[in-house]
């Protein structure tokens, strides 16, 4: 039997959800939030309903650092079907063009070369990017096409996995803002046959290991059979969301000053500048600060627990 709903609680950390297929990221976010009975929750970059895989969910104070995960690199495995283009560039859309598939593995591997490194990508109309305050997908559903500017992205790795015509499987390591559906659609055009996504799984966000993910079904089972506090054991610490930033350990005096929101002058022997993750003298994560060029610690996003 499901636990009766109670007043929300202050719970803090990052939950690595293995998102199920067929649900929007926001819908599954709300379900996870209810299971944890959390006052505050947010995800770190939406996955399409068709997609599965890693969706870090920030609870409580972790929401202050969700942008760092949104801006981080992602890794995906995608299966594309060659020969058909759809209006959404995935299997959930309507087929708009069908062409013969006359390409082999060698041609595909050659075509992949032009998609590696720093490239420009025109976002799909079926995206949450906004034009005049309205998401592009709302225009698309009305049959309206809005002119979009190409955006710079980086494909760090584009690995050929398998080709069993007409299905092609790839692994992609990419920067923020990359649309895998658009990548597949563009590849289909280069190959001359068209293509769309049939399977998409996010394997990694930042440095989070795939082994740390938990399915919603398993989380739900835990919530029904274990005390609420047992769920908290599956939350990762707040500072994991900003693990890519340099670490700065403070003295007791500096910790006290930063706790009052004060800027602190310090001897920057390591010459660290820009954003850092701050830890107190007793190794407690305090938040994120900016180190200025005149060696001042300027608190920006601080934990309040």
Swiss-Prot record:
UniProt superkingdom: Bacteria
Keyword line: Isomerase, tRNA processing
Active site per UniProt: 48 (nucleophile)
InterPro entries registered for this protein in UniProt: PsdUridine_synth_cat_dom_sf, PsdUridine_synth_N, PUA-like_sf, PUA_sf, tRNA_psdUridine_synth_TruB, tRNA_sdUridine_synth_fam1_C, TruB_C
GO biological process: mRNA pseudouridine synthesis; tRNA pseudouridine synthesis
GO molecular function terms listed in the Swiss-Prot or TrEMBL record: RNA binding; tRNA pseudouridine(55) synthase activity
Catalytic activity: uridine(55) in tRNA = pseudouridine(55) in tRNA
EC numbers, comma separated: 5.4.99.25
Coiled-coil ranges (or none): none
Enzyme superclass (EC): isomerase
Biological role: Responsible for synthesis of pseudouridine from uracil-55 in the psi GC loop of transfer RNAs.
UniProt family annotation: Belongs to the pseudouridine synthase TruB family. Type 1 subfamily.
Name listed for the protein in its UniProt record: tRNA pseudouridine synthase B
Species per Swiss-Prot/TrEMBL record: Actinobacillus pleuropneumoniae serotype 5b (strain L20)
């Amino acid at each position: 039997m499901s636990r009766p709903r109670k007043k929300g609680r202050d719970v803090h950390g990052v939950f690595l959800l293995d998102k199920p297929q067929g649900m929007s990221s926001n819908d599954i976010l709300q379900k996870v939030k209810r299971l944890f009975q959390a006052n505050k929750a947010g995800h770190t970059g939406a996955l399409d309903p068709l997609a599965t895989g890693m969706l870090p969910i920030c609870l409580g104070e972790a929401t202050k650092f969700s942008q760092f995960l949104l801006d981080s690199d992602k890794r995906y495995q995608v299966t594309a079907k060659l020969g058909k283009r759809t209006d959404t560039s995935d299997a959930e859309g309507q087929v708009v063009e069908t062409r013969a598939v006359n390409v082999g593995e060698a041609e595909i591997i050659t075509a992949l070369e032009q998609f590696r490194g720093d490239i420009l990508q025109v976002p799909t109309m079926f995206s949450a990017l906004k034009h005049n305050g309205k998401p592009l997908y709302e225009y698309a559903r009305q049959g309206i096409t809005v002119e979009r500017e190409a955006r710079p992205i980086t494909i760090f790795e584009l690995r050929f996995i398998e080709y069993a015509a007409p299905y092609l499987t790839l692994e992609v390591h990419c920067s923020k803002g990359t649309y895998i559906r658009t990548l597949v659609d563009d590849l289909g055009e280069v190959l001359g046959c068209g293509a769309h996504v049939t399977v998409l799984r996010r394997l990694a966000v930042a440095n989070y290991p795939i082994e740390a993910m938990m399915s919603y079904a398993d989380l739900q089972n835990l919530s029904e059979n274990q005390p609420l506090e047992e769920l908290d054991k599956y939350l990762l610490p707040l500072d994991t969301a900003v693990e890519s930033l340099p670490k700065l350990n403070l003295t007791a005096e500096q910790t006290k000053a930063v706790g009052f929101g004060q800027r602190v002058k310090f001897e920057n022997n390591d010459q660290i500048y820009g954003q850092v993750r701050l830890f107190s003298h007793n190794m407690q994560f305090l938040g994120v600060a900016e180190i200025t060029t005149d060696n001042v610690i300027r608190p920006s996003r601080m934990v309040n627990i």
